[in-house]
């Protein structure tokens, strides 16, 4: 781990390109963006990383009280549970993980919305 701050944010080395607001997970000692609802997200990128080796600040899920902005991967209803790929959780009782609840709606992929975050868990 590269650096820890007092507010639950850490800086980590990116394993590839990451956009601001994307959920990230560990992979080979670095962080990469989550691409599946079953990915074990550790946080949300607070800034983007253009390429592998770049340093990216990450808000660690569940490590502080508050909210964080995510980049939606599709439409999300206000109040919906959000998966690590940035989508609305729609399949109750599956292996999809839930990492937060949308505090505002996203109309389409790419929208930045605020979520109340939590350590990822199943229903």
Language model region names:
Residues 1-123:
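Surface-exposed, low-hydrophobicity beta-strand/loop segments enriched in small/polar/acidic residues
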């Amino acid at each position: 781990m590269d650096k820890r701050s007092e507010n639950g944010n850490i800086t980590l080395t990116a394993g590839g390109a990451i956009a601001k607001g994307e959920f990230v997970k560990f992979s080979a000692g670095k962080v990469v963006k989550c691409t599946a609802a079953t990915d074990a997200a550790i946080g949300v990128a607070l800034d983007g990383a253009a390429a592998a080796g770049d340093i990216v600040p990450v808000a660690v899920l569940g490590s502080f009280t508050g909210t964080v902005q995510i980049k939606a991967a599709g439409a999300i209803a206000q109040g919906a549970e959000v998966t690590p790929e940035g989508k609305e959780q729609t399949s109750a009782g599956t292996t999809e993980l839930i990492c937060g609840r949308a505090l505002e709606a996203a109309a389409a992929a790419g929208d930045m919305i605020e979520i109340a975050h939590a350590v990822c868990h199943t229903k």
